[in-house]
């Protein structure tokens, strides 16, 4: 796997990730989240049609159900879910973080009870890598401890240094396997800890680097200051992945600072709650004002949903709890995110990213009438 930066506008990077099989992902890119080997409600063909180039799978959930062995028997996650474009799998670290009240964390790994059937599970860096090898995703992640917010300096330091030790164990377990292992920078909101983490991971010479431990409750300005502090220490010739950060404005600010890859459940989860993203801000479809509104969600949008259906119809589907409503909303929200990344790539190519960002914020403030 190679990363090629084709042009920059300030710190914003327009590049591409070239995989060993010849597949190419244009960056900056948003990765829809397919937690259970599916992006909820959509077929792989629908994902492809709306422009998704790479998706994310969840190691934690797939390990527990159906199990890595079943997916491996299909030939891997691509064949299991019939998605032929690249897949990135996370390590399970964030899900372990979310089980804070019922898990025990040690140097060896994380011990917890399965939220599915209650059986005890022991997840180590080596086990996470083995599961991801069985899933056979294109990009795999080291197991890390997602540092909570708030955390004291000492708590963040101890957590970050254990994640570094786990990164070394992950690399050793990975060996020369064909998948591409990314390291995860931790350190809370402490700039010196983030820099220490990044510099130590760079010594491992991994194919890519993720910024983890953000979008866990910290203020927006603290998140952006953390990115400003750490990104100069992350190699320019490798892809940079900001994990779990997903509001549209967060994507713009991440790209502005040199991030190449994003993922978040927000567009698909919000779609199922009739909370829709548009060029002019949020549209809350459950509002009664949309009962008789004949316009599409966004008159500037070319997605399948906006080209065919009215706000009134989608409002009706939501009121009736019809599955089609959630599906059409998800198509729109994911198209919005994918198209936003396309617009940012073009703005970087044309060296007008700052103008794009100003227009983005101005339009978002207009609101939907």
UniProtKB/Swiss-Prot annotation:
Primary enzyme class: transferase
Domain of life, per lineage: Bacteria
Renumbered residue ranges of the record's region RNA binding: 244-250
Pathway: tRNA modification; tRNA-queuosine biosynthesis
Binding-site residues for substrate, renumbered to this chain: 90-94, 144, 186, 213
Pfam family, one: TGT
Annotated EC: 2.4.2.29
InterPro entries (UniProt xref): ArchSynthase1/Queuine_TRR, TGT, TGT-like_sf, tRNA_ribo_trans-like
Annotated binding of Zn(2+), by residue: 301, 303, 306, 332
Cofactor(s) listed: Zn(2+)
Gene Ontology molecular function, alphabetical: metal ion binding; tRNA-guanosine(34) queuine transglycosylase activity
GO terms (BP aspect): queuosine biosynthetic process; tRNA wobble guanine modification; tRNA-guanine transglycosylation
Record-level GO cellular component terms: cytosol
Catalytic residue list: 90, 263
Catalytic activity: 7-aminomethyl-7-carbaguanine + guanosine(34) in tRNA = 7-aminomethyl-7-carbaguanosine(34) in tRNA + guanine
UniProt cofactor note: Binds 1 zinc ion per subunit.
Keyword terms, alphabetized: Glycosyltransferase, Metal-binding, Queuosine biosynthesis, Transferase, tRNA processing, Zinc
S-S bridge residues: none
NCBIfam families associated with the record: Q_tRNA_tgt, tgt_general
Subunit structure: Homodimer. Within each dimer, one monomer is responsible for RNA recognition and catalysis, while the other monomer binds to the replacement base PreQ1.
Function: Catalyzes the base-exchange of a guanine (G) residue with the queuine precursor 7-aminomethyl-7-deazaguanine (PreQ1) at position 34 (anticodon wobble position) in tRNAs with GU(N) anticodons (tRNA-Asp, -Asn, -His and -Tyr). Catalysis occurs through a double-displacement mechanism. The nucleophile active site attacks the C1' of nucleotide 34 to detach the guanine base from the RNA, forming a covalent enzyme-RNA intermediate. The proton acceptor active site deprotonates the incoming PreQ1, allowing a nucleophilic attack on the C1' of the ribose to form the product.
Family (UniProt): Belongs to the queuine tRNA-ribosyltransferase family.
Protein name: Queuine tRNA-ribosyltransferase
Gene from which the chain derives: tgt
């Amino acid at each position: 796997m190679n990363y090629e930066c084709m042009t920059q506008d300030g710190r914003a990077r327009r590049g591409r990730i070239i995989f060993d099989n010849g597949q190419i992902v244009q960056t900056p890119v948003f990765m829809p989240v397919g937690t259970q080997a599916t992006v909820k409600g959509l077929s792989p063909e629908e994902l492809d049609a709306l422009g998704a180039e790479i998706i994310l799978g969840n190691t934690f959930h797939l390990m527990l159900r159906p199990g890595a062995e079943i997916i491996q028997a299909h030939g891997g996650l691509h064949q299991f879910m019939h998605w032929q474009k690249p897949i990135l799998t996370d390590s399970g670290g964030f899900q372990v973080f979310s089980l804070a009240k019922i898990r025990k964390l040690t140097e060896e790994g994380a011990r917890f009870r399965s939220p599915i059937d209650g059986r005890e599970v022991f997840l180590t860096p080596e086990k996470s890598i083995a599961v991801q090898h069985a899933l056979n995703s294109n990009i795999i992640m080291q197991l890390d401890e997602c540092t909570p917010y708030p955390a004291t300096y000492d708590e963040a330091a101890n957590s970050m240094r254990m994640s570094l030790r786990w990164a070394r164990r992950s690399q050793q377990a990975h060996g020369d396997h064909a998948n591409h292992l990314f390291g995860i920078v931790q350190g809370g909101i402490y700039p010196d800890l983030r820099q220490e983490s990044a510099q130590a991971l760079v010594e491992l010479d991994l194919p890519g680097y993720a910024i983890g431990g953000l979008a866990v409750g910290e203020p927006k300005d603290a998140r952006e200051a953390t990115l400003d502090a750490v990104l100069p220490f992350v190699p320019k010739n490798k892809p940079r992945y900001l994990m779990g950060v997903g509001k549209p404005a967060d994507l713009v600010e991440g790209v502005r600072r040199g991030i190449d890859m994003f993922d978040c459940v927000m567009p698909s989860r919000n779609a199922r709650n009739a909370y829709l993203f548009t060029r002019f801000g949020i549209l809350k479809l459950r509002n009664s004002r949309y009962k008789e509104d004949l316009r599409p969600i966004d008159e500037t949008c070319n997605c399948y949903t906006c080209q065919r259906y009215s706000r009134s119809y989608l409002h009706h589907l939501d009121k009736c709890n019809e599955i089609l409503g959630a599906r059409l909303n998800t198509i729109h929200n994911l198209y919005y995110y994918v198209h936003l990344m396309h617009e940012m790539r073009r703005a970087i190519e044309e060296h007008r990213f700052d103008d794009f960002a100003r227009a983005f914020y101005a339009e978002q403030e207009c609101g939907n009438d």
